[in-house]
A protein has these predicted regions:
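Flexible, glycine/small-residue-enriched loop-and-beta-strand segment within the central core
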Residues: 1-71, 97-98, 104-106, 110-111
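Acidic/histidine-enriched, glycine/proline-rich intrinsically disordered or flexible terminal extensions
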Residues: 110-118
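C-terminal/domain-terminus segments
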Residues: 70-93
Length: 118
């Protein structure tokens, strides 16, 4: 299953060919911890909202969490268990928590071009 922020599903854009593996979460809201002050309760902290944009043919691995305000670029791959807190550029591999780009897949390099797409 994939958990989608249904209260704010209008903030989620998923283009054609996107793969989202099981146990992922797409969150369009989070508590704004930067606003935390001594004496505040968790319930007093404001929410921050942001759009999630999953571009054409990107892939989100099992158990990933995609946070608000993030774009995953065309053809990008996010490895299993990653927490995506910032944009992931097109044609890259991002891993970890928080997700960081560890590899690029140059579009003009034949090694990374599928024969099916030619």
């Amino acid at each position: 299953y994939v958990r989608v922020d249904l209260n704010h599903s209008d903030l989620i854009e998923i283009e054609d060919g996107v793969h989202i593996a099981g146990d992922c979460r797409l969150l369009c809201h989070k508590k704004e911890l930067a606003e935390y002050k001594q004496g505040m309760t968790y319930g007093m902290m404001p929410y921050k909202y942001g759009k999630i944009h999953l571009c054409k043919n990107c892939a989100i691995g099992t158990g990933c969490i995609v946070m608000p305000g993030v774009t995953v670029g065309e053809g990008a791959v996010v490895g299993a268990g990653a927490m995506v807190t910032k944009d992931i550029p097109a044609w890259t591999l991002a891993l970890g928590c928080p997700a960081k780009v560890v590899k690029e897949f140059p579009k003009d390099d034949p090694k990374y071009v599928s024969k099916k797409s030619q």
